[in-house]
UniProtKB/Swiss-Prot annotation:
Similarity comment text for this entry: Belongs to the UPF0434 family.
Higher taxonomy: Bacteria, Pseudomonadati, Pseudomonadota, Alphaproteobacteria, Hyphomonadales
Record-linked Gene3D superfamilies: 2.20.25.10
Domain of life: Bacteria
One GO cellular component, as annotated: cytosol
Designated name of the protein: UPF0434 protein HNE_3545
Amino acid sequence: MSDLPDQTPKDDSVLFEANGVDPRLLEILICPATRQPLAYDRARHELVSKNARLAYPIRGGIPIMLEEEARDLDDTEGTAGGGEA
């Protein structure tokens, strides 16, 4: 048994909430299609892969990292601001 305190969040909303994303989680998540880093789009509540031109939804505080669930980015998305790196 470990003497270290439990660092596990008690609630998924701690990691992805309406006002931001935990940067520690964003550092370890990658796009399943390209294996490249993701950016958090606060306005749409999605994780964006600029290289794959896909946006992965976050539902109930849980990122859905499945390509078939991702939204295709249009020509104006993925190049402008709106996301966090």
